[in-house]
Amino acid sequence: MTQTPPTDESPADHRPSDIADTPASVATGTDDRYDTATDGGTDIDGDTNTETDTNTDFLVTPYAVRGEVDYERLLERFGADRLTDAQRARLPDHPTIRRDTFYAGRDVDAFLEAADCGESHAIVTGRGPSGPMHLGHVLPFYLARRFQRETGATVYVPLSDDEKFLAKEQSFAAIGDHTRDNLRDILAVGFDPERTRIVIDTADADVIYPIATRLAKHLTPATVEAVYGDQDTVGLQFYPAVQATHLLLPQLVAGRQPTLVPIAVDQDPHVRVCRDIAAKEALPVDKPGALLGRFLPGLEGPGKMSASGETPTIALTDDPETVAETIHAHAYSGGRSSLEAHREHGGDPTVDVAFQYLRYGFEPDDDRLAEIAADYRSGALLSGDLKELAIERITDVLAAHQRRRDALGDLETELEPYRLTADERATALEAAGVPRLSFPAR
């Protein structure tokens, strides 16, 4: 069905804004927004620039996470809704949903209604290619695959190579290398090419840039400053319009439909900016929804795992020996200071990183996970034994992923079925009210 192109004369916004009326708070200390990866699980590339609390001593921004995050406080601050038991029962049966890893959302019911009725619905989950992918990066992609297989969702995967060039001290060539490497890991997840579109900002600039420009007209400097604070370059000031393009692209290509964005909670401000743009009714789109998740903890404790800092990570290409060495050397333990004390008082699985990895899905059996937790609390299971369990499960998952990755052929050939078609590009531009100009090269 042909969509009616919007005009530039958009009506006044009569729907409530998702952007809070407060200025960006400023974190104390060194400004390290670009020293910590934005990719805490989905790098869908979050209302205020930061969420800081002097009592709990944590920091959450789209560009940095530090300290022990108070997830309930973030929900109050961001205005999202906790997932209900009824919603969980209708979402895919996945460990990250059953175990409250994804714990909140926006407009989840509309997505579920479309899925239940067999109507069009989409998932958007992307990646900022600033380095090799690690465990925290790939989990949202496997969740998206589960959605695709169980609900029939179309999955859109944007790669924000442009934003990483702007936000990181890396060359375009280096970002390009990371992009190609990351694409192999994304393809290895096993998405259905008929219902998956992978978009790379610089490679697909013919459609991304005109739409982003169209959306930028409805995004004020005051909004960008309120959400992100001061930006170092005009490129980063413009990037929220590109991000909004990612989230609205499924509807511009295939018409209005509920769209759900599974993301780590630090990335929620990006979704709210896009929802604010969609509410202006300048384009034939609905507000995208969100599924908000907790961070896969960094090996050394509170916070999230990062591929861009100095903290240790488990890369998707690590061999079993490297995984074992990394976990034994760096994984924060919830055990006691001595064997005797551990046997007597037991350990704390809620802070033990090896257990948390099992909880995030590497131990798929809920009953077995509960048994491991009980044994650890009683002192029957030692910290070293718990680490060995985590190593075994993680290496099994990585081995399967690496086999699929190694089986891929030429990247351009493998990627081709996942790219936007010429008709899809034209439809998206028309829906956004952007005339497509095409001139032959000299």
Feature map (PLM): residue ranges:
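Short, glycine-rich nucleotide/cofactor-binding loops
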Residues: 128-138
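Non-catalytic terminal extensions that flank enzyme cores
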Residues: 1-128, 275-324, 328, 334-337, ...
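A conditional alpha-helix N-cap/helix-loop micro-motif detector
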Residues: 101-105, 137, 231
